[in-house]
Design a protein with these regions (language model features):
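Basic/aromatic-rich interaction segments and small domains that mediate binding to polyanionic partners
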Residues: 2-89
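Non-Sec secretion/translocation targeting segments of pathogen effectors
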Residues: 86-98
Length: 98
């Protein structure tokens, strides 16, 4: 298999593993001049043809994560359930009027 075919297969595997909407946590980003803070959660928006995960982070920033350079992982089922519980708590909070 040549290099281009290997890169194409890698990108396809990233697209299958991290479809749009996948929740991730960025563990570290070393080689960016303005890195996202460690342990910031985000949502995969798309994976491009070289396997970069383009994400919207919970801190309001958007940036590409480069597999092999940046350290990240999918949120566990337990972490996803905790996020849903937090969202439910916010939805059920009393509304304060003025």
């Amino acid at each position: 298999m040549n290099r281009l075919e290997a890169e194409r297969r890698f990108a396809q595997r990233m697209k299958e593993t991290y479809p749009p909407g996948t929740r991730i946590v960025l563990l570290s980003m070393e080689n960016d001049p303005r890195p996202i803070e460690d342990n910031t959660r985000g949502t995969v928006m798309t994976v491009d043809d070289i396997g970069t995960l383009h994400c919207d982070f919970d801190n309001g920033r958007s940036l590409g994560i480069v597999p092999g350079e940046d350290s990240f992982r999918r949120l566990t089922d337990e972490e996803l359930a905790e996020e849903q519980d937090e969202d439910m708590d916010e939805d059920n909070a009393p509304v304060m009027g003025m």
